[in-house]
Swiss-Prot record:
Residues 22-27 form a propeptide. Changing K258N: Reduces activity by 99.2%. Reduces Km for substrate 10-fold. It comes from Aspergillus niger (strain ATCC 1015 / CBS 113.46 / FGSC A1144 / LSHB Ac4 / NCTC 3858a / NRRL 328 / USDA 3528.7). This is Endopolygalacturonase II. The lineage of its organism: Eukaryota, Fungi, Dikarya, Ascomycota, Pezizomycotina. Glycans are attached at N240. Belongs to the glycosyl hydrolase 28 family. The gene is pgaII.
Length: 362
């Protein structure tokens, strides 16, 4: 039988330090300096500190299956060696998990090594963070820089993100593309509070799920605050989504709902409230039911219904070449909308709007 001293020495050698434990108790606090040590020792720790970890190429920082109630702290600078692969760079699951960043920490993905202006095409790029099965948990105060591709893939119930910074500003000039901040699917109860995002795709994309709340967001440089695309997935229901008190600037779109042509599903109980836009290049408000192979066709279908949509105090300006509002619905599939204090200026009026409820203006 190994002595406690020998076990402790082994932990130090392997990139792990254990504290607050006796030989027969689970360790309370662990500091890991390598991804391998974190994966091997995570189940024994109620508090995990990830200290200046450099994740090897083609490897996930694997924090799946954490013990309920575990606290995870990112400390120092977390980095990732280069390989063309699908990722994710980090994956985490468990219940009642609390994730925070220590003062001065940075999760630096150095995405420019992968960026080629082609996003999901071109060279293979890893997604950043899978929050799949990270239930009844919270992620607070993380500082993330230059993700190669999408940042958070969220498939979880009762999860809250607070004060998360995703700074992919370098991607504006270095080929960043498809760098979505929060992609939500198959989730019930997702709260995203005061995020700061500069990226080159959706600030928020809700593809399926219920009870989603996004508030106090700052969204710069991307594709705006989106529902969809909805359709052609195993789950094609989006219900009870509130997006409020947020700004969207220097982006392609501000408010967007899009559904897949020929698909079935439903989008309902959607509220956009107190959204301020500026510097929008394509559409201020766009709701369209004609997406196919990732592109609009101009031919809407009605298999995915869009009901009980409320826009209130959605204001601001778009570029002179942009369209202020574009509403393209299938026959009878858009209904029960509320439209209050929607004022988008600076651009063109659309002449191609179709089948939208009379309370809206186009």
């Amino acid at each position: 039988m190994h002595s406690f001293a020998s076990l402790l020495a082994y932990g130090l050698v392997a990139g792990a330090t254990f504290a607050s434990a006796s030989p027969i108790e689970a360790r309370d606090s662990c500091t890991f300096t390598t991804a391998a040590a974190a994966k091997a020792g995570k189940a024994k720790c109620s508090t995990i500190t990830l200290n200046n970890i450099e994740v090897p190429a083609g490897t996930t920082l694997d924090l799946t299956g954490l013990t309920s109630g575990t606290k995870v702290i990112f400390e120092g600078t977390t980095t990732f060696q280069y390989e063309e692969w699908a990722g994710p760079l980090i994956s985490m699951s468990g219940e009642h998990i609390t994730v925070t960043g220590a003062s001065g920490h940075l999760i630096n993905c150095d995405g420019a090594r992968w960026w080629d202006g082609k996003g999901t095409s071109g060279k293979k790029k890893p997604k950043f963070f899978y929050a799949h099965g990270l239930d009844s948990s919270s992620i607070t105060g993380l500082n993330i820089k230059n993700t190669p591709l999408m940042a958070f893939s969220v498939q979880a119930n009762d999860i809250t993100f607070t004060d998360v910074t995703i700074n992919n500003a370098d991607g504006d000039t270095q080929g960043g593309h498809n760098t979505d901040a929060f992609d939500v699917g198959n989730s019930v109860g997702v709260n995203i509070i005061k995020p700061w995002v500069h990226n080159q795709d959706d600030c928020l994309a809700v593809n399926s799920g219920e009870n989603i709340w996004f508030t106090g967001g700052t969204c710069i440089g991307g594709h705006g605050l989106s529902i969809g695309s909805v359709g052609d997935r195993s789950n094609n229901v989006v219900k009870n989504v509130t997006i409020e008190h947020s700004t969207v600037s220097n982006s392609e779109n501000a408010v967007r709902i899009k559904t897949i042509s020929g698909a079935t599903g439903s989008v309902s109980e959607i509220t956009y409230s107190n959204i301020v836009m500026s510097g929008i290049s394509d559409y201020g408000v766009v709701i369209q039911q004609d997406y196919e192979d990732g592109k609009p066709t101009g031919k809407p279908t009605n298999g995915v219904t869009i009901q009980d949509v409320k826009l209130e105090s959605v204001t601001g300006s778009v570029d002179s070449g942009a369209t202020e509002i574009y509403l393209l619905c299938g026959s009878g599939s858009c209904s029960d909308w509320t439209w209050d204090d929607v004022k988008v200026t600076g651009g063109k009026k659309s002449t191609a709007c179709k089948n939208f409820p009379s309370v809206a203006s186009c």
